[in-house]
Amino acid sequence: MSDAGEVTRSNEVSRLNRIVVLLTLALTTGLLADSGDTPLIDAVKRGDHNAVRTQLRGKIDVNAPGVDGTTALHWAVRADDAELVTMLLRAGANPKSANRYGLAPITLAAMNGSAKVIDLLVSAGVDANTSTTEGEPVIMTAARTGAVDAMKALIARGANVNAREKWFGETAVMWAASENHADAIRVLAEAGADLNARSTQLDAPVLEFPRSGGPNSPLPRGGWTALMFAARDGAIDAARALADLGANLNATALPQTDVPLKPEEISAAQAKNIGTSALVYAIINVHYDLASMLLDKGADPNVVDGAGMGALYAAVDMNSLQWVQGRPAPILTDKLDGSDLVKRLLAKGANPNARLTGKPLKRHHDAGSTMNFGEGTTPLIRAARTNDVAVMNTLLEGGADPFLTLPDRTTSLMIAAGQGYGGIRGEGIRIVVPTPESSIEAMTMLLDRGLDVDAFNNAGNTAMHAAVARGDAVVKFLASRGASLNLKNKAGFTPLDVALGKGGGRGGRGGGVVRESTAALLKQLMEQSGTKTGAP
């Protein structure tokens, strides 16, 4: 190294030494704590009461903040140290100061559930209705924590139990319900909280899947009651408390629309209970025990949403969940499963023949799986789609009419044979995957009740057309039950044509795929019966 380099290095070392000396002096003279905070804040963080007293005897700024605006009082409250809080308040600490995140000490006290510290702060002049800069009232913070004593302290000091946060217009009772804090709900109710208040965020944008073109219409985010939050989150204790306290069990969230609703439309929808109920929210989130409890408390199983979907259809749908898009299926942790709930719903008066009036609301986990299901779909038709034989049997015994069809005259038999089936993916709750065996079992159940094996829909397709994609065993079974082998659909194609890949398309009727084995079977069956194949 050159002499110039040595001199430069020596100067750098000398400068660094001077910085170290200055920092040491700052620390020893109390100008700066080793954490970057003031010595007072550092002492409070350590919980060192003697050091705090020493600092307070000096001429210091008790409200001097750290780099993020957090003061010594914030840290004392966070530590739930009432003695330190008292010392700092007596020394002139500002009880209303907020850090750069908009948090005042009283919000931290509510997070801790500290009634004593809340009393100290309110006695020092803090408003019990303080909110964060994000608009979260402190009573809501305490409700989310479930801190009953803290809530009582705030209420005693004038906290508004019906205050709303600014993002979604939710209230304390909604947050308590979502977190399953039943005791907190009781405290709020006793203080006059509106158990049927609704959140005010009402927009429900409709999304589109570019590949399929199928609509994915999320559940409406607004107009929710506390019971709906409890139902969604499986908060059964909170839901039971709300029911016992008189919450409306049949209130519905606002129906889904492509455009924002006008005020008069909102009022009309709420008056008619057109929308998703807490019972349905519980079911589509796989909280079957909670749903059963709501039924016992008097929930109406026949309340339907804007698509005509009620609790029974939802339970049938969830029992054999279809296309799981991009995420695992829900995990069943309840004592009851979907088939159990179907029985309970029927016993409680659910209409087994209730039809959808439109496309069912998409729930992100089944996007596209029921695109061809909409107006006219019954719970039985939905169960037939996945050959959920146990549920089909329960529905039929409960009064389901197997002769009801979709508007295009597609029968439950065609659906059971594979008409329009889109497949199932994912793992989680019990998933019924249609197989040739399950199709045969489902079709046997329907044919034994008198369905026409050769019934055709508006496109001219029969169960045999649909069976081609389900497998040889299904084709052979239908033939054994007398199904015609060479009926042409409106496009002029027979089941054999479909097996040969003609007239293929979406809907489980060939898709352009050549099924050589099935084609050979159909030719054999037609030859045995003396039917002309019409094939080359």
Question: Language-model features: where?
Answer:
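N-terminal segments that cap or nucleate solenoid repeat domains
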Residues: 34-75
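Ankyrin repeat A-helix N-terminal signature
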Residues: 42-46, 75-81, 108-114, 141-147, ...
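Bacterial N-terminal signal peptides
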Residues: 20-30
